[in-house]
């Protein structure tokens, strides 16, 4: 009996399912049915499987596509190799979807950025560089999916996000040398101007922004998956989660700084709810000064430093989008296939 796969979870998790689904279509069933329970727009970035994907609310989906299938909901967090840190999300989905008995090599992403999002990314990055008087841009994603805003406080009980104090420190220090673009869907509470752009962009536009940037710095969240897929150098700081599970230690362009290595306890998400593990992990992203310095150095070692000069800056929200009436040139488009 043929299978239909249901994919759910956060954006990074959904993205990590794509390589295994592509392999399944190419090697097992070219007509495979994939049901998107979340983040359907991310499937559009895969030229291989985008025509095999249906949203949950598609009219007639059950009768027309599912009734004669075995319905499968792959759950990587319940895979022994995953919760014992033997595979990352990409490999875990591959084992579950393609029935690998041995741990497979990590499969590559095959992402396609459409022209609209490429243009958006290039325009925004160039605008921010010009505004801050810098020649290089760094995308900084400080918060993971567990972040919560409570009044003037931003907290992450899951221990995956940068502490607010360190967010300000990172932006201030990197802003001396680079145009900093903060990737966040939550407003940062502050009474002073941050030397960074905080654009309002959707997930596909962020793909374009990271593609046009020079470096990525982040935590256990979506942006690092984009950076890996788009061959961007990156620094990933982990706290409560294991880099072997959620990141790409084998990527030579990645610097992984494991802040929670000596103190974290595995939190069995989607298996059980371990309140003790969550409580013990919640401070896993508090940075000591020496760790903070390592983070900054990992960026400056790759990009170099720029001369200091005073720059007047204003908040950047959206980038100009080229039209047929523009007299200036459009940015260079990337190849259709962007391979990790």
Residue spans of the language-model regions?
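Leloir-type glycosyltransferase catalytic cores
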Residues: 78-127, 131, 250-308
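An N-terminally biased module of ancient metal coordination in phosphate/nucleic-acid-related enzymes
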Residues: 307-340
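Structural motif
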Residues: 2, 137, 215, 315-317
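Short acidic/His/Gly/Ser-rich catalytic and metal-binding motifs that mark active-site loops
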Residues: 145-152, 189-192, 265-266
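N-terminal pre-catalytic "stem/leader" segment of glycosyltransferase-like enzymes
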Residues: 1-47
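Short, well-ordered alpha-helix to beta-strand connector turns
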Residues: 28, 49-50, 66-69, 178, ...
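Donor-binding and catalytic core of enzymes assembling or modifying cell-surface/extracellular glycoconjugates
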Residues: 11, 15, 153-244
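Conserved nucleotide-diphosphate donor binding/catalytic pocket of glycan-assembly enzymes
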Residues: 38-120, 127, 131-153, 241-244
